[in-house]
């Protein structure tokens, strides 16, 4: 079969491969070097086909197609990565709301509530996707502003955050209002995941093993502003409250710690270390990573920045298409280098100032609603999310899609979206 496909002309090869699901195409890259080269050489036509036929309209509005000569698999997989994160978070937020807000705690009650749960999950996806775009774009603009010598945000006398306003100017009135209304629900759901139940007293916390309180506000702000919604999803999926809190503390310590600089050597150090065996730095680094539970051979991250994985990539040849794919650019909101972290961390906003003040002011300025009281609160948003109005809640978001208007894009069931080794892994 492989020989028959590879014997076809290039145009026919592209037409055969392009309609395949994106996960299948990515798996074919691993079959052999010939298939990898075939897909790499035809990735522009593959990406154009999927952008036209499988991407939802709201994704293309926030991430427009690049120049036809620049479109590639990285653009396509980056959007599927964002959709995957939005879908995962919508599933987890809906499950939490079903259990803790709507009090559907038994299998029978959950089965009865399933239609409302499905509508809530589907309607949350485009809104959380827009939030992913906001945090990603804000971080990029913030880093660029500070790297070019701009005045830090916390030193500017502003009423509205200028970078937030610049990002929100990309959203139409309906998107801005809907995302603003759902933002408190997303943040409160994530906050609930990282703290013990509010009803649990000190004795009950000790009995159930809730050893730590909720993280500080600056930790939450750093997670969503620096790590993004993908990092929030990682913490959310960690099983066990103490394990989640330990993962948060480990990540926050890794992000905020300063690199240890070795002290300058004195003249006596030559005599002192004379005859001693010099330790191997590479072995020490590998040992420390193994001790910390990180192994480069079993790492499943798309673009891991741990030292062992980076050293493993450097050993590969530089004249081979296998190691010069567009996907080597990494996923959206990949970890920042240390020099950019030093710029952005001291300039973080307080958690209560992120999004809310600027969005509400712009909503009133654009006259999307007449009064601030007309903006729906969380309980009203939840009722709207589960309301049965005869649609799945995605019709309004599909306007302007380049695909067939009758086509429904299912990001939850897309092959490779939920399977291990999928697009975002």
Can you say where each PLM-predicted feature lies in the sequence?
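A generic structural signal for ordered alpha-helices
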Residues: 6, 13, 102-106, 157-164, ...
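Short hydrophobic alpha-helical "box" of cullin-RING ligase substrate receptors
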Residues: 4-39
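Charge-dense, extended regions
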Residues: 182-425
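Charged/polar low-complexity intrinsically disordered regions
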Residues: 43-264, 268, 272-274
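Eukaryotic N-terminal targeting leaders
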Residues: 1-6, 10-11, 45, 50-54, ...
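Short interface patches used for recognition in eukaryotic signaling and trafficking proteins
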Residues: 1-2, 17-20, 109-115
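Histidine (H) residue identity feature
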Residues: 23, 36, 49-50, 74, ...
């Amino acid at each position: 079969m492989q020989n028959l496909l590879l014997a076809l002309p290039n145009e026919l090869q592209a037409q055969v491969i392009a309609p395949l699901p994106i996960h299948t195409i990515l798996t074919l890259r691993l079959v052999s070097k010939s298939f990898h080269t075939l897909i790499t050489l035809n990735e522009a036509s593959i990406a154009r086909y999927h952008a036209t036929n499988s991407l939802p309209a709201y994704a293309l509005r926030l991430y427009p197609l690049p120049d036809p000569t620049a479109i590639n698999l990285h653009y396509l997989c980056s959007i599927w990565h964002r959709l995957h994160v939005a879908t995962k978070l919508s599933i987890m937020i809906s499950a939490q709301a079903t259990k803790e807000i709507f009090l559907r705690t038994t299998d029978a009650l959950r089965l009865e509530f399933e239609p409302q749960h499905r509508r809530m999950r589907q309607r949350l996806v485009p809104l959380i996707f827009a939030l992913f775009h906001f945090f990603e774009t804000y971080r990029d603009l913030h880093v660029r502003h500070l790297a070019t010598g701009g005045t830090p945000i916390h030193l500017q006398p502003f009423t509205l955050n200028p970078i937030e306003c610049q990002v929100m100017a990309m959203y139409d009135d309906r998107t801005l209002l809907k995302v603003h209304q759902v933002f408190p629900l997303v943040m409160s759901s994530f906050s609930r995941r990282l703290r013990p139940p509010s009803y649990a007293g000190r004795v009950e916390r000790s009995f159930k093993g809730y050893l730590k309180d909720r993280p500080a506000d600056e930790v939450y702000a750093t997670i969503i502003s620096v790590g993004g919604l993908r990092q929030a999803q990682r913490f959310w999926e960690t099983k066990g409250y103490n394990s989640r809190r330990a993962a948060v503390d480990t990540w926050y310590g890794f992000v905020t710690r300063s690199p240890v600089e070795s002290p300058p050597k004195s003249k006596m150090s030559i005599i002192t270390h004379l005859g001693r065996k010099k330790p191997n730095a590479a072995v020490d680094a590998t040992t420390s990573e193994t001790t910390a539970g990180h192994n480069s051979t079993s790492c499943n991250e798309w673009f891991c920045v741990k030292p062992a994985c980076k050293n493993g990539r450097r050993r590969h040849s530089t004249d081979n298409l296998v190691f010069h794919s567009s996907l080597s650019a990494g996923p959206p909101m990949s970890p920042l280098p240390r020099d950019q972290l030093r710029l952005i961390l001291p300039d973080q906003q307080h958690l209560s100032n992120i999004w809310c003040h600027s969005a509400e002011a712009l909503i009133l300025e654009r006259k999307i609603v007449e009064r601030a009281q007309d903006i729906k609160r969380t309980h009203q948003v939840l009722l709207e999310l589960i309301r049965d109005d005869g649609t799945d809640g995605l019709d309004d978001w599909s306007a302007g899609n380049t695909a067939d208007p009758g086509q429904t894009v299912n990001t939850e069931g897309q092959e490779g979206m939920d399977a291990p080794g999928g697009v975002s892994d």
